[in-house]
Amino acid sequence: MEIRFNPMKITGVGAFGDVRGRTAAGIRSVYFILCTGYYDGLSEDIRELDRKLSTDERCIYRRVTDLPVMGVREAAEYGEKWERLCRGESVIPTETEKALKEVCSIYRSLRKNINPTIEKNFAAVLMFYSDRLLGKMTCDSGKCPKLVCSGRIGLKEYLFFHMAALMGIDVMLLCPSGLPQLPEELERVYEHIRLGEC
């Protein structure tokens, strides 16, 4: 499946709730929005977005405020899963595998001189997040998957949400205190909306 990012201009939180990523002719339209700043009615607009998308039967909606913490047992389990994936075994859905490998490639290009253990640990965290947060959020379900994060975003977190967008999930990241430190080459993927002052 080919991904086309942000086919329509999104102007705010409410507009994200109104658009639906869709698939046509083998191309998936996906919205990946990064919002910075704050305005007086933002909290109310987020509550309204939650209400609207939670009750919309055409959507699979999830809002995240904190990413889960991976324990030692899970780290070993997902690390082994990554090693099996590298050997060519099919251990995760195809779209997830494709997105994971693309994001790991981005990570390698951004973090020079990483060794296989660091990459395995990074991939393990992404697979753990995916299992815990995305679950059945696929565009194969016939519904539009939408994910909103209103927590702290660093590079690792951003790359997880980037992976979700590559899987065909509409993603909106709310960063009221400002844009996280992201490399310039990632700017082509997301649309940045300034909601107000940081």
Task: Describe the function of each predicted region.
Residues F16-V19, D45-E48, L155-F160:
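Short alpha-helical segments and helix-capping/turn motifs at coil-helix boundaries
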Residues M1-G14, T23-L126, E185-C198:
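Conserved N-terminal ligand/cofactor-binding loop architecture of enzyme catalytic domains
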Residues F16-G26, L133-S141:
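Short boundary motifs at domain starts and secondary-structure transition points
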